[in-house]
């Protein structure tokens, strides 16, 4: 099962338990996800299955909201969990958001872009200095080594270029491929099936980086390839990434800086949604990370070629109690010697 990963449907097996009790156990909402959360209030999500005719309907729910699970992805946009009728104000707000993000977000929802992304679109990034997906994966794989066996997110996964390589590595206990675009998630699934990518640990999830449906300090590492420039609420998204990373967690991102294609591109107009955001310098990117909550000493930004920025962030690890006690004892001893 591609979409559900650890929430996979449990089949029937021989048992002495009466059929009705077995059905109640299988379809009762008793499985709580330890990573995914409601994007609105952060509450835990319970996996629920119901049988409608010959179909099994799956969803994730809280006490107040329900999020659908289709054959491709778990839909964890905040608007997907709405159970009350859509008001005029809700509609106006959603239309405003769609207009303000028409280039950065809405363009990537079109099926044609999902189709061409690995058929020429992504290849043009080489001209800007992007190393190429295999070289990028090699660096990501090395950087994520401390996250082996943990939970890794491929944010803005697109067509699954990095997702498939992370999945094939079998290095992680759980892999979440997250994107806002339904079309990109469908393309990720199609390519995973076509390439027979291992999907036991993989969950595809539709979500907004500015409202991540993830628990605090639940993620060991996160990748966002060629993505920062296309996030309409970049600062909020980066703060969300910092929120969900564990102590010692790692964030790896690639994006564009000015001059990537030999000319200066217009910066993103505030609230305009009319263009991508090409960053001015490594200093600007580093400051964005620091403002999001990353420690300055744990942020590294470098430029490859004419305009590919590679960002690496490491969250400080929690101090080991024994080390703290040893340091405190040493200070006491030193002070005693001065007396």
Regions found by a protein language model. Name each.
Residues 151-211:
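Class I SAM-dependent methyltransferase SAM/SAH-binding core
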Residues 210-222:
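A short acidic, Gly/Pro-enriched loop at the edge of an enzyme's catalytic core
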Residues 277-293:
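Short alpha-helix
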Residues 235-247:
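A short glycine-rich, Lys/Arg-flanked "PGG" loop and its adjoining helix->strand segment in the class I
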Residues 221-233:
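A short SAM/SAH-binding and catalytic strip from SAM-dependent methyltransferases
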Residues 23-107:
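N-terminal auxiliary segments of SAM/dcSAM-dependent transferases
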Residues 71, 77-147, 161-165, 187, 250-279:
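Conserved class I S-adenosyl-L-methionine
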């Amino acid at each position: 099962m591609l979409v559900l990963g650890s929430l996979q449907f449990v089949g029937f097996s021989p048992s002495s338990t009466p059929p009705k009790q077995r059905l109640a156990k299988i379809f009762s909402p008793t499985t709580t996800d330890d990573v995914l959360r409601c994007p609105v209030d952060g509450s835990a999500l319970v996996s629920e299955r119901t049988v409608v005719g010959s179909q099994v309907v799956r969803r994730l729910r809280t006490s107040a909201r329900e999020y659908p699970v289709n054959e491709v992805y778990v839909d964890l946009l905040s608007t997907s969990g709405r159970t009350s009728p859509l008001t005029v104000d809700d509609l106006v707000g959603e239309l405003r958001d769609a207009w303000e993000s028409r280039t950065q977000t809405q363009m990537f929802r079109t099926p044609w872009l999902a189709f061409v992304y690995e058929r020429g679109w992504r290849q043009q990034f080489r001209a800007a200095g992007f190393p190429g997906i295999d070289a990028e994966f090699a660096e990501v794989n090395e950087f994520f080594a401390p996250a082996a066996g943990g939970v890794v997110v491929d944010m803005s996964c697109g067509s699954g270029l990095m997702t498939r390589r992370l999945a094939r590595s079998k290095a992680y206990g759980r892999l979440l491929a997250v994107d806002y675009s339904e079309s990109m998630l469908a393309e990720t699934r199609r390519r995973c099936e076509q390439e027979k990518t291992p999907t036991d640990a993989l969950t595809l999830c539709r979500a907004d980086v500015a409202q991540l449906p993830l628990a605090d300090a639940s993620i060991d590492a996160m990748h966002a390839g060629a993505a920062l420039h296309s996030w309409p609420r970049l600062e909020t998204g980066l703060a969300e990434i910092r929120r969900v990373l564990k102590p010692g967690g790692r964030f790896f991102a690639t994006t564009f800086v000015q001059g990537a294609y030999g000319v200066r591109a217009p910066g993103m107009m505030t609230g305009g949604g009319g263009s991508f955001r090409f960053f001015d310098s490594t200093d600007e990117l580093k400051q964005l990370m620091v403002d999001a909550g990353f420690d300055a000493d744990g942020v590294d930004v470098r430029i490859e070629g004419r305009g590919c920025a590679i960002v690496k962030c490491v969250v400080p690890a929690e101090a080991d109690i024994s080390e703290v006690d040893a340091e405190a004892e040493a200070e006491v001893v030193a002070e005693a010697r001065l007396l």
